[in-house]
Design a protein with these regions (language model features):
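Beta-propeller blade-edge and WD-like acidic-aromatic loop motif
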Residues: 1-16, 33-36, 40-60, 78, ...
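Short loop/edge segments at beta-strand edges and connector loops
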Residues: 19
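Conserved beta-propeller blade repeats
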Residues: 22-38, 64-79, 107-125
């Protein structure tokens, strides 16, 4: 399976191919500077610098079964990601430069959805109490991000 990463210009209505790869990549998210995209593929996270597009691996420590729920904090210092472990999908917080993630979801399964604009809260969806119903939750990020 091949992937093509494109940026769509709303003003012109044109798409620009940033990267073509034989790897399956998905879920691009902007870094706050607009200079880099964060994508996932094969359970790993990658940065794609727009100035010199390439898949640059992000060190996620033990988190090697990441799904497409990931994003960079508004201040660019943190990455939140969802990764499958024994309990199911859990949410983790780690430095944007890479490193060992720390679990932040109170229960599993939990899937990250978004940062609050001020970087102090996370929105996520989760199934609780053995139910098959998915609800929306928020979680404070200690000290903000």
């Amino acid at each position: 399976m091949a992937s093509s990463l494109e940026i769509f210009d709303l003003a012109t209505g044109r798409a620009r191919v940033v990267l073509r790869t034989e790897a399956r990549i998905e879920a691009p998210n902007w870094d706050p500077s607009g200079a880099t995209l964060l994508v996932n593929g094969g359970g790993r996270l990658y940065r794609v610098p727009l100035a010199e597009p390439a898949l640059v691996p992000v060190d996620t420590g033990f988190a090697t079964r990441c799904n497409n729920d990931h994003g960079i904090s508004p201040d660019g210092r943190w990455i939140v990601l969802s990764c499958h472990r024994e309990r199911g999908s859990e949410m983790f917080l780690m430095p944007a430069g890479g490193g060992e993630p720390v679990v932040i979801s109170p229960e599993a399964p939990s899937w990250w959805h978004g940062w609050s604009p001020d970087g102090t809260r996370l929105a996520y969806v989760a199934a609780r109490g053995g139910r098959r119903v998915i609800d929306v939750y928020t979680l404070a990020v200690a000290g903000g991000a």
